[in-house]
């Protein structure tokens, strides 16, 4: 129940504040309600809302629903809970075998244009895949490489950068990541310590999701131009880069601290326009992360329901 989950969360963070418990319970209840509403919309013959004369259609297309069925079936076969737990309980940074199968399914190429070796599908197809990956808690670098690195190149990359990296991202030959955080505190352009000068980057980024396995990173660095930041593409297999694994609360993916010492870099987009570009990139990625969370919460709700329906105590079903 939401109350039981709330108590567990409070125990983990070491507090017994009644107000916090109430907030957690209310948030969970709202999430459960939202999931129920999503289910209702999916099951309804028409998931449309009329606003005046305008009609907003929230239904997925038949092709997108077919993609959902295929993705769910694939992950049920290749990413069951026991397989996920095995990866999370080991020192492996990701499930390499599952990642290769995901690449073969073409998911890493979903929104990459056909001219760069992709499938040229829409963001909605990626939303469907994101929900199913979240449902399975798949321990692979999909979000880092697809939601962030690929999207950064699509938004800001030059023709030459796109021609070099997008085909490799689509085929799984390369894995990308995004490096913003520099430790404690909320990142801001005014307190960035990582700097870029003369085609090189120097600084430390921690934590970087999937930073230990990525081939390149999109690095947010300070700039004395424009909004105070710029984005740089840095290949991670070079002498000016060192990486160290770090532990975080997110066990579904590996994290690393990455040190850059005059590491060669390429500017992505305009110098001094990086912060606004980063915010736009993260806003788009947040939609996909939210759908992952909907998928995971929906799976948890289904498991809790099935457990409650089959659980007997004191001679009767609970």
What are these regions (language model features)?
Residues 43-55:
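Short, Lys/Arg-enriched N-terminal segments with co-localized hydrophobic residues
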Residues 179, 204-242:
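A short core secondary-structure module
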Residues 172-182:
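A short, Trp-centered hydrophobic/proline-enriched beta-strand micro-motif
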Residues 18, 33-35:
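Short terminal hydrophobic/aromatic SLiMs and anchors at protein ends
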Residues 103-163, 167, 171-172, 210-216:
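Internal helix-loop-helix
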Residues 1-16:
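Extreme N-terminal basic, low-complexity initiation segments
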Residues 58-70, 135, 241-318:
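Glycine-rich beta->alpha junctions and the first turn(s) of the following alpha-helix
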Residues 194-196:
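A structural signal for short hydrophobic beta-strand segments in well-ordered beta-sheet cores
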């Amino acid at each position: 129940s939401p109350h039981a989950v709330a108590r567990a969360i409070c125990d983990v963070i070491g507090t017994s504040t009644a107000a916090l418990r109430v907030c957690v319970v209310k948030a969970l209840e709202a999430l459960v309600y939202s999931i129920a509403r999503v289910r209702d919309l999916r099951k309804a013959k028409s998931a449309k809302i009329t606003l005046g004369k305008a009609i907003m259609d929230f239904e997925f297309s038949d092709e997108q629903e077919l993609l959902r069925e295929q993705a769910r079936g694939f992950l049920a076969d290749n990413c069951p809970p026991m397989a996920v737990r095995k990866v999370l309980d080991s020192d492996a940074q990701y499930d390499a075998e599952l990642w290769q199968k995901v690449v073969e399914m073409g998911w890493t190429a979903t929104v990459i244009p056909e001219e760069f070796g992709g499938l040229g599908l829409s963001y909605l197809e990626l939303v469907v895949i994101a929900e199913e990956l979240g449902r399975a808690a798949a321990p692979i670098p999909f979000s880092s490489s697809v939601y962030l690195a690929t999207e950064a190149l699509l938004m800001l990359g030059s023709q030459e950068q796109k021609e070099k990296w997008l085909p490799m991202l689509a085929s799984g030959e390369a894995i990308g990541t995004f490096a913003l955080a520099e430790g404690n505190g909320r990142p801001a352009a005014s307190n960035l310590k990582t700097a870029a000068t003369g085609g090189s980057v120097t600084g430390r980024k921690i934590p970087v999701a999937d930073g230990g396995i990525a081939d390149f990173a999109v690095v947010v660095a300070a700039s004395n131009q424009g909004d105070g930041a710029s984005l740089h593409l840095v290949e991670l297999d070079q002498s000016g880069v060192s990486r160290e694994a770090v532990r975080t609360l997110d066990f579904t993916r590996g994290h690393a601290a990455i040190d850059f010492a005059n590491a060669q870099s390429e500017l992505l987009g305009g110098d001094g326009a990086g912060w606004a570009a980063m915010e736009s990139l993260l806003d788009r990625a947040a939609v996909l992360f939210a759908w992952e969370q909907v998928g995971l919460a929906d799976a948890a709700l289904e498991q809790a329901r099935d457990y409650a329906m089959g659980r007997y105590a004191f001679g009767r079903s609970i």
